[in-house]
Structures are given as C-alpha cells and as structure tokens.
C-alpha cells in the first residue's frame, strides 16, 4: 500500500486578531492525563509537544474541546515539534489511511513563544477536525478536493487554509490572552 503525504498548512499570513468567545465553554469529559496517554486519539510524539499540549489543554477551552472531539473519530493524530520552513508555523499532514483508521501528523515549528505555539496548535487541531468530518478523504486527490471545497490554496503547492482553522487560532489566542498576563514565556 502506498502512503500519500499531504500538507494542510497553517500558512498564517495575517497577524492573529484577539477575539473572545467563551460562550458554552465546558470542562472536557476526558482528563488531561488520558488525553496525553497512548490510549488517546491525540498523541504527543516528543517531550516538547507533550509540554505544549499540557499548557494548551489547561489554558484553552477550545483546545480541550478539540482534543475531546477527536477521541470519537477515526483519526489518530500525532503531534510533534520540529523545524519547518520559515513561513510555516504549523502543518497537518494526512500520512496514511486504512479502512479503519486515518493517520494525521501535526507539526508545530519551534522555537517560538509558547503563547504563539498554542494558538498554532489550536489552528492545526481544527484542520484535523475538518479531516475527521470528511471520512472520504483518504489520499491526496480526495484531500485536495475537500480543501478546495471548504477552504482555499493561498500559496499553491498543496498548502491549504480554511476560515474555520484561522478562527480557531484567533479564539485560542483570545483565551490565552485572557488567562496569561505574561505571553513572553519561551518554548525552549
């Protein structure tokens, strides 16, 4: 079976605006310890990704809900931190699919300020939820058709963007701004 690698990028061309939407915020039904375990559908692939996820779940009701929502999908989402090209702060890749499960890898570019990294994580988790909502997306052809239907390709070359992911990043930024007076904490 041939594995297709597809990039769903968070090419953030705009500075994230701070908007707040705390209506309907609820505690997630899964504790952070479960979400960070190997039984979770969202798995941290390195130590920095785990630290980032711990901060994100604690500080952002949006991210806590996203991770909870991913538990009931056919996706296994691996989250890692790594260096990426300069214009790309994060990306979600469909890395493979079987009849029962699809694998997505989210990469968050480091180094960076933790506040910004958490916002990018929320953006990329939204892309994972967009994929989860489209069970027919299983390869590069169906992924491209899906993202051209729900979003756009701002820079070409297989990088896609959606208004939903941009909004998720803005919402997470607002949640962090409301909960953390000091945003300058470095990731590394």
Regions found by a protein language model. Give the residues of each.
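Catalytic Zn2+-binding segment of zinc metalloproteases
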Residues: 125-141
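Metalloprotease/metallohydrolase-associated module, dominated by Zn2+-dependent proteases
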Residues: 80-94, 140-188
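Short amphipathic C-terminal alpha-helix that caps PH/PH-like domains
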Residues: 121-125, 169
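Active-site scaffold of zinc-dependent metalloenzymes
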Residues: 82-116, 128-131
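Bacterial N-terminal signal peptides
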Residues: 7-18
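Soluble non-cytosolic domains of exported or imported proteins
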Residues: 111-120, 155-163
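A metal-dependent hydrolase signature that marks the N-terminal structural subdomain at the beginning
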Residues: 21-96, 100
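Positively charged n-region of N-terminal signal peptides that target proteins for export
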Residues: 1-4
